Amino acid sequence: MSVPVAPKKSCYTQLRDNRNAARNNNESILSLGDTNANQIMLEVSSSHDESKTCDLGDEIGNTNSSEPENRTHFHKEFHQLQGFGKGSQAGSASLKDFRLSSTIQRELNEEHTVERGTDSLQTTRSIQGPSLSSWRNVMSEASLDVLAKRDAEIPRHVPKDKLAKTLDNEELRRHSLERASSSVAAVGSLTPQHPQPLSLDSREARGQIPGGGEGPQKTLPDHAVPAAFPATDSTSEGKSVRHPKPSTSESKQSTPSETQTVGAHVLQVCSEHTSHSAHPEPALNLTLASKEIPSKLEAQLGQGKGEAKLDLKYVPPRRVEQEGKAAQEGYLGCHKEENLSALEGRDPCGEAHPEATDALGHLLNSDLHHLGVGRGNCEEKRGVNPGEQDSLHTTPKQGSASLGGADNQPTGKISPCAGEKLGERTSSSFSPGDSHVAFIPNNLTDSKPLDVIEEERRLGSGNKDSVMVLVFNPSVGENKTEVPEPLDPQSGRSEARESKEVTTSVAENRNLLENADKIESTSARADSVLNIPAPLHPETTVNMTYQPTTPSSSFQDVSVFGMDAGSPLVVPPPTDSARLLNTSPKVPDKNTCPSGIPKPVFTHSKDTPSSQEGMENYQVEKTEERTETKPIIMPKPKHVRPKIITYIRRNPQALGQVDASLVPVGLPYAPPTCTMPLPHEEKAAGGDLKPSANLYEKFKPDLQKPRVFSSGLMVSGIKPPGHPFSQMSEKFLQEVTDHPGKEEFCSPPYAHYEVPPTFYRSAMLLKPQLGLGAMSRLPSAKSRILIASQRSSASAIHPPGPITTATSLYSSDPSADLKKASSSNAAKSNLPKSGLRPPGYSRLPAAKLAAFGFVRSSSVSSVSSTQSGDSAQPEQGRPATRSTFGNEEQPVLKASLPSKDTPKGAGRVAPPASSSVTAPRRSLLPAPKSTSTPAGTKKDAQKDQDTNKPAVSSPKRVAASTTKLHSPGYPKQRTAAARNGFPPKPDPQAREAERQLVLRLKERCEQQTRQLGVAQGELKRAICGFDALAVATQHFFRKNESALVKEKELSIELANIRDEVAFHTAKCEKLQKEKEELERRFEDEVKRLGWQQQAELQELEERLQLQFEAEMARLQEEHGDQLLSIRCQHQEQVEDLTASHDAALLEMENNHTVAITILQDDHDHKVQELMSTHELEKKELEENFEKLRLSLQDQVDTLTFQSQSLRDRARRFEEALRKNTEEQLEIALAPYQHLEEDMKSLKQVLEMKNQQIHEQEKKILELEKLAEKNIILEEKIQVLQQQNEDLKARIDQNTVVTRQLSEENANLQEYVEKETQEKKRLSRTNEELLWKLQTGDPTSPIKLSPTSPVYRGSSSGPSSPARVSTTPR
């Protein structure tokens, strides 16, 4: 598609600088409003902004390090998606690190941002060519994938149901990853846009991102972003479909760790999405991109890097908002120029930075931030995961939002860090979506004091991001002039709305924290998705493209976009208002009413649940969209199963999630059909993008069939396939037809009907998606109400194009359709939407329906809540809305509801009508439900409704109870009165007959009176609804006109861009030709010079050869002469040397002879002297020897004589001594003669004693040895005893552990068995639903009992898409 632009370190540096600058600008300002709309600057967010900015700085630093990781995922895909992906990856990695470094909340926000940023970047890449179309498709698909992935990851601590749903979501994710790769990219961008403090907002942002992705893809000129912002909300609702994250919501609520996982997973998902979008989505994106890419590719390639840098350049939200306003006013011209300038400046990194400071510079920053921030966002997302945990723990709802709204997480984190993070994130990667979010928050801030402020802070961060997005969008506008901006506004708006919604939900639904968390995260995500629609103005054109594909969905989106286009940045505040109007508490209606119609900011507590649910629904729709987009996944039961998960039933908001899961089941929403089917078509076509018309025709049956145009859908203003598209839609259709590449725009139908996905989701949820079982299971009355309110908000989003549709939808609203058979389609759609059992399920026993969560009374409430969902978008107002629409008994509620409806109507045109119709619908629904639904089911539904809104009794239940009480009770009283009144005098028979007649007449009168009262009440409600519808229609018409004007401007700008591209292309071709000519000349000259050189070389060689030969001869002669002379000289020298040598030899010989003679003489003389001296000495020695011998002989003789004499004397002396001693001995020994015997006896005794002693010693030794052995043995015994004790203790411990493990094993086996049974049941339900969907006649209404309000509505009402959609069930 486009050449991937590798993010530069300088880009990261720029991003860091931009973020710091953004923090400086954003520290004091947390813009909560659209740039065009009231800018609600939350100073409170300043800390968050600072934190965010700092974190962004860190993030950027980290991005450099982490960038490889994200870039690894995204780079592969980003190569296809374009250079933006890389920046996105790097940014996301950096953001991730930054997120880690920042506070956990800030991390949550960053995670959202990272996810959104990466997706956005990816989307931007994919969409660079077909900026709007590509953006939208990429964004929608990316968001879908991201959501799917996020869903897959989010179910961290999710119950089995949640896990099952998560698994299905993951499957959807896998399918949609391929489809929504581009969408993920878009989502990534949007995600950075919506990393608002509120994690829910983040999720909304994410949810919105798909829509935003569509929106940005469709973003015509960046200036359209203002309108797109409101549209973003619409898209965000549509994107909420993407909320196949019901499990994600619950997962969020389940655990921050889940959130973390989700965040990381989302990054991966973004990568996968990016790759998918790069590959599968390229079919759409490439088609769109292929057309626009040629022109934009060059600019984007040049600018892609610049854009990455722009991403690095973070523009302060306030600046971005302020400049965004200015830019929106001068968006077309200035934005582009600034984009270019910013891009150019950003390429140098230093130049763009100052420009980023400028409004357009900021816009460029926003756009680039989309890309660069995308990287940062990915990082942020990773980092956010930990942050998300804190966010989840700190703010359960926000935590949820952080999961779902990793993109919007900064909002969830609006804590002290949230402000900083908002600023940073806004600066970094939230600029696209956040810019709008900031705008939306203004209205929200006005409407909501606390929650709204909190939400606004989140939105404010989102707005900052949105502003940044605006800045970024311009740069993208250059590269993807149309894509980034729309993404930004839409994302911002939907995020803002979702933030509001989340805030309200947080404040109001603290008790619903789990559900709210899930739903809010889903809503946040939806908002994220919706935020993406913020660029609906740009998207408006794109929406048109989508519209052809999914007329209803497209139309709704188109209307929304038209409204958005009509109301630029100003629209976002209206969007907030519209959200508020869409039962302003119903924050999801932010997207629903992206139109410039200001909606009163009602408490969003109610709105939050609805919006959350709506967001979830959108996300679900998105999931479905993804499912459809990928391999026509919507029919896949896997997706349905996860959606069917019963846990959703527990959570009203989970309903939306379940809807998301349901959507993939193959209940093609109009949006999914448009968004995903188109991608599927394109994918199926093998990357060939068919014209939107072809796609529309192709998917028309799906749109008509699976697309259950529930009352919510109708209310949302989504035109059924039959409904004509709004002007903008038509234009988009034309564009789509003209530009198959724009089918991407179509592929995200939500973009057209941001809310419709929610409506479809609700309708589908209630009707076919989960098969009623899962749907009713998932949505309690409260959930259904939320769904209805979300639908209504979605319808509010859709009003621009689908005002007519809205009218038909409203006429088909449960009140009108259910009451009046004429609105059969609406009744059908309302039934599923309101939670009524689908026609097929109406036959199911009440117990079964109740088990599924489909209670007649509840569904009636849901139907009315579809409209009342608009007015009762706040969870509070859900029951009230039902009673208001369905029951005139609650005048106060009615009054509030009409006002809500009026805002709704204003926002979505259809909602007012739906509200008026809703009352009749409710009144009708209660009776039919009571008739068709067992009391138990009704009671369950009523209980759900009562639980949600005990004050407001469901109209059906009230009507049924009233009717039942009066019919049986009053008639009896009247009979008694008749008896008393008639005198007993007449004949008893006559009296009896008269009494009976009177009683019958009275009963008939009572019935007629009641009917008349009901009809009057319905008439009043219908009048109010039509008034609201008229106001909304006018509003949307005006908005549509403004959108058309903007569309024209955008088309002009696009034409200019194309002209420029063509000019540059021609110039490039010319230069190429010149280059080729010069190359040819050069080659010829080189050849000529080569030949010339060769000739010269040969000539030179010959000349040198001759010279060499001559020189050789001369040198040889000289050498010969020299040799001769040298030889002569040598000979002479030899002769001389020989003569001198001979003379020397003779002289030496003579000298030698003389010397020898002298030496011989000396030797002889010395020998003679030595001989004479020797002889003399010998003689002397002989003489001396003789003398000595003689003297010694004399001495020897003398001594011999003396020794003999001495021997004789000694012998004599010895003899004398011996004799003497013998005598003495005899005398002395006489007394001792017996001593010897005594000695012998003593010796014997001693020997005996010695033997005894030896024996004793031996025994002692043996005993000592034994003692030693005993000591050793005792020690060994002690050791063995200790060992034995240790072993016993271990045995005891092992026994305990074994018991515990066995118990755990048993429990696990039971759990597995239960899980298996549940899976089987869900599979059966899924198969049943799939069978019903497959076998259901798309054109014929379901055969309901003639008394069934749905049946009557469908039979009497004109064949509307709603009826068609109802039939698929």
From Swiss-Prot:
Region (Localization to the growing distal tip of microtubules): 801-1150
Record flagged with keyword Coiled coil: yes
InterPro entries: MTUS1/CCDC69 (IPR051293)
Annotated Polar residues bias: 246-262, 392-401, 804-814
Subunit structure: Homodimer. Interacts with KIF2C and MAPRE1; the interaction is direct and probably targets MTUS2 and KIF2C to microtubules.
Entry's family note: In the C-terminal section; belongs to the MTUS1 family.
Protein name according to UniProt: Microtubule-associated tumor suppressor candidate 2
Organism: Homo sapiens
